[in-house]
Regions:
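Basic, low-complexity segments
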Residues: 1-25
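Short, basic/hydrophobic alpha-helical segments
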Residues: 80-87, 169-197
């Protein structure tokens, strides 16, 4: 028996689920995916297989096999999900957002589990880590792709690699979180379902010159947070290709500092030296607290890439407005052109809150972290269906025109 809240949504959920039917191969898989999706949308305290099976009237063992072992196309579901999100939330000013989140675990048998750092957990803990791609636009925001991070040491352990409980395919090779992020960005842009001109991320991703270069090659602008120690030049770095050494020496091809070259500086030191008149107050939207005011400053710089001059772009700095100016100053790098407005640059740089809120909503409302499967395939299957449930409820939220945030049940009907 379905809850009254979900009963009103069931026709729309059936239509939504039908979009993904071709990725489940057999009728049994389509039926199981429908029931699991309903279970994720229901207000169940703990959305594991047993509890979902009990609430939706499905055999637990069959649902477990569907999640852990059935070879359905979860990547195909992600492509269709991105098309749905593009239809519902797409806008020319869309932004792709990168971040990772941890999934605490008590056991040692899950794929990729181990003591590792998790920014969302705020500590080193026994957990799995997933790298995620979000999409944000003026119409809303949600999660649109996922990758399970498998540490190099974990993959190099023969016992873990051969574990039947983790069941990691032999074809899976080590990839850094940055590489996983790049895979998702590339795939999303190549699919073309999500209109997005920008990419943003925190310093864990923004510090990577290689990832920034990938975004540029993909034809997008980035505005990413970077560490305060990141070095740039505020003027011509005065590097050039040195002349041939003698008449018979080989022509030189690599740029080197000229005698009048100035050293690169840490962005933190550059920002601290800015005059007060360089700071301009702007209001930006940031999470459940609504619009907030910050002070921003920016200047054109040359990025330092692998110890040499890289592309020219913007250094953006943000500090709290008013009496909190002694608080942490955040710095960003962007490859946007000189003509881009400060207001747009500031808005994009401050959009990382969207993926943080989506992690909180997905874990609290659609059971993103409630899974109890250990297999590599099981992780991808559960997370994929949770992303589908989240996007569906986000679309319902938009249709109803009702605010949905932590503490407000996703399935609650609009007020009369």
């Amino acid at each position: 028996m379905l809850d009254a809240d979900l009963a009103a949504l069931l026709p729309a959920l059936e239509t939504f689920h039908a979009r993904f039917g071709r990725f489940f191969r057999r009728s049994e898989g389509r039926a199981a995916s429908r029931k699991y999706l309903i279970g994720l949308a229901l207000p169940i305290e703990r959305k594991n297989v047993e509890n979902i099976a009990e609430r939706v009237g499905a055999p637990p063992r069959k649902l477990q096999e569907f999640l852990s072992d059935s070879p359905w196309d979860d990547d195909g579901c992600i492509g269709e999900l991105q098309q749905f999100v593009g239809e519902q939330l797409g806008a020319p000013g869309g932004v792709l957002v990168l971040d990772d989140t941890g999934f605490p675990k008590k056991g040692i048998h899950s794929a990729g589990v181990g003591r590792q750092s998790s920014g969302t957990l705020g500590r080193v803990d026994n957990c799995q880590v997933g790298v995620f791609l979000g999409y944000a636009s003026p119409h809303g925001h949600t999660l649109v792709d996922r990758r399970l991070y498998l540490a190099e040491g974990w993959l190099a352990d023969p016992a873990k690699r051969a574990s039947r409980r983790a069941a990691v395919p032999e074809t899976v090779r080590f990839a850094t979180k940055l590489e996983l992020a790049g895979e998702m960005l590339t795939a999303a842009i190549e699919r073309g379902h999500l209109p997005a001109g920008w990419v943003t991320a925190d310093a864990a991703y923004g510090d990577s010159a290689d990832l920034r270069a990938l975004v540029a090659r993909l034809g997008r602008w980035y505005c990413v947070e970077v560490s305060g120690t990141t070095e740039v030049w505020t003027a011509d770095p005065a590097w050039a290709v040195p002349p041939r050494a003698g008449r018979t020496g080989r022509p030189r091809t690599k740029v080197r500092p000229r005698s009048d070259a100035t050293p690169a500086q840490a962005v933190r030191e550059i920002v601290r030296a800015l005059p007060e008149e360089a700071w301009i107050r702007h209001r930006v939207t940031e999470g459940e607290k609504g619009p907030r005011e910050y002070e921003f400053a920016r200047l054109r710089v040359v990025e330092k890439v692998h110890r040499a001059p890289g592309p020219e772009g913007w250094l953006l700095a943000r500090r709290p407005a008013g009496s909190d100016q002694a608080a942490e100053i955040k710095c960003y790098l962007s490859n946007a052109p000189a003509t881009v407005a400060l207001a747009e640059l500031a808005a994009v740089g401050c959009l990382r809150w969207t993926i943080e809120e989506d992690f909180e909503l997905a874990k609290g409302e659609v059971g993103l972290d409630h899974y109890e499967v250990t297999k590599f395939r099981g992780w991808y299957h559960h997370i994929t269906l949770a992303l589908l449930a989240l996007a569906f409820l986000k679309a319902v939220q938009r249709e109803w025109g009702k605010k949905w945030g932590p503490g407000i049940r996703a399935g609650d009907p609009p007020a009369a």
